[in-house]
Amino acid sequence: FQPSLVLDTAKILLDNYTFPESLMG
């Protein structure tokens, strides 16, 4: 179990989730 891996995955998921919102304004 690697906490850093989980944090990186969570960050990627959050980035992918918020990107369309920021793109739409």
Curated annotation (Swiss-Prot):
Keywords of this protein's UniProt record, alphabetized? Extracellular matrix, Secreted, Transport, Vitamin A
Subcellular location(s): the record lists:
Secreted, Extracellular space, Extracellular matrix, Interphotoreceptor matrix
This chain's function reads:
IRBP shuttles 11-cis and all trans retinoids between the retinol isomerase in the pigment epithelium and the visual pigments in the photoreceptor cells of the retina.
Example of a GO MF term: retinal binding
Entry keyword Transport: yes
Q: What phylogenetic lineage does the species belong to? A: Eukaryota, Metazoa, Chordata, Craniata, Vertebrata
Where exactly are the transmembrane stretches of this chain? none
Instruction: Name the GO cellular-component terms.
Output: extracellular region; interphotoreceptor matrix
Write down what this protein is called. Retinol-binding protein 3
Principal cellular location given in the protein's record: secreted
